[in-house]
């Protein structure tokens, strides 16, 4: 039993970072996960929630400050404030160091291997004005807002500093909104705007034009697209580099969305090659079919990966970019059964990537490359790109 109650304020020494963006502290040998703190600090922590084994809290007063602490650029980034950013009080360089620690820890604990990955920063290097997709809640007062951490409480805002400039200059922040339906805002690489509510465009264009590495994608606002304005280009570069694609290769693009990776790969494999895009989302599939309607070396499969992959034969390279919970054992086993010469895995969660990496290593695949990309500055989230090749029996 925990001897803490919600609302208690305790003084704690702040320990190491944990997966999920909290820092670990202890009170009478009981673990407390703390937000708004940094390793090495001493803080007064207000307990915000409790479960059977753990307590969670916010550092509401810093008694001993870390040299890595900075003033949060956003006025809403504070205990009890907006829950979107959890690293605004930490310098950019240290944010990346913490993300490296998180990746290393997950691979040590789950995959049982030691790694030393680079975590690279991405323009804009200030960590602000990078987010091209933003969902806004509506408060009881009819104002735009974002949710407090793990809460239904809406924190009213008139700007979001991690959002791109066009979102912040939009009129949506200055209007009164009726009802509870959320607003979804999107800005393309071509600076086109869409504001969507209840599935309908209420401001801007119905479709957005994205240009990535000389490939053009016309996408609907409900289709998945990377949030960081510069993420698509960087991810394409890393995936192409690690996959080592050649003319005539046969490739699978799993969880392929609208075809971010399919478009450049189709050019590299040429008419003698073939790429299979598998995606279950209706909006993404609709967009992908339009984008690639005249491409004979692209085959689109609408459905779950675990149902479609088994039917595709003679695949040499597999690219996968699954949701946060990863591909999982069933899909990874299907990938292994295909015996691809190389696998490139894009992941937004180090824990699920480490879990799936363990399965691949146990089945004769070698982890050759792993890099962290800081595509979510001011938050604990980090994108990873990993590549694997099948070990050759001697």
Located regions from the model:
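Terminal RNA-binding accessory module
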Residues: 1-78, 151
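Residue-level signal for inorganic ion chemistry
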Residues: 25, 40, 85, 349, ...
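Short acidic-glycine loop/turn motifs at beta-strand connectors
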Residues: 28, 51, 138-143, 149-151, ...
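Broad, structure-driven detector of short, well-ordered beta-strand segments within folded domains
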Residues: 45, 136-138, 181-193
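Extended interfacial segments that mediate partner engagement and assembly in macromolecular machines
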Residues: 60-75, 79-180
């Amino acid at each position: 039993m925990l001897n803490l109650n919600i609302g208690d304020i305790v003084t704690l020494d702040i320990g190491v970072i944990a997966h999920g963006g909290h820092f670990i502290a202890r009170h009478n040998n009981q673990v407390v996960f703390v937000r708004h703190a940094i390793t090495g600090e001493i803080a007064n922590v207000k307990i915000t929630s409790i479960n059977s084994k753990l307590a969670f809290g916010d550092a509401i007063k810093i008694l001993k400050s870390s040299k890595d602490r900075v003033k949060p650029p956003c006025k809403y980034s504070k205990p009890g404030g907006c829950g979107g950013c959890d690293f605004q009080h930490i310098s950019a360089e240290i944010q990346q160091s913490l993300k490296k620690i998180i990746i290393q820890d997950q691979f040590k604990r789950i995959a049982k291997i030691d790694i030393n990955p680079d975590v690279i920063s991405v323009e804009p290097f200030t960590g602000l004005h990078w987010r091209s997709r933003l969902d806004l809640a509506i408060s009881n007062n009819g104002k735009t807002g974002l949710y407090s951490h793990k809460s239904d409480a809406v924190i009213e805002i008139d700007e979001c500093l991690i959002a791109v400039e066009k979102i912040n200059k939009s009129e949506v922040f200055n209007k009164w909104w009726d009802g509870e339906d959320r607003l979804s805002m999107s800005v393309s690489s071509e600076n086109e705007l869409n504001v969507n509510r209840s599935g309908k465009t209420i401001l801007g264009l119905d479709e957005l034009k994205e240009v990535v590495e000389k490939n053009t994608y016309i996408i609907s606002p409900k289709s998945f697209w990377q949030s960081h304005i510069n993420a698509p280009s960087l991810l394409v570069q890393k995936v192409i580099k690690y996959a080592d694609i050649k003319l005539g290769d046969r490739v699978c693009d799993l969880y392929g969305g609208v075809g971010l990776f399919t478009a450049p790969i189709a050019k590299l494999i040429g008419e003698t090659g073939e790429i299979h895009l598998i995606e279950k989302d209706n909006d993404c599939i609709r967009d992908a079919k339009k984008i690639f309607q005249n491409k004979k070396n692209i085959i689109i499969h609408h459905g779950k990966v675990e149902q479609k992959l088994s039917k595709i034969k003679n695949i040499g390279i597999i690219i996968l970019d699954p949701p946060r919970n990863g591909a999982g054992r069933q899909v990874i086993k299907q990938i292994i059964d295909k015996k691809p010469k190389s696998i490139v895995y894009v992941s937004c969660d180090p824990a699920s990537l480490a879990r799936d990496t363990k399965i691949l290593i146990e089945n004769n695949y070698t982890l050759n490359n792993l890099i962290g990309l800081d595509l979510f500055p001011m938050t604990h989230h980090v994108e990873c790109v990993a590549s694997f090749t099948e070990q050759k029996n001697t």
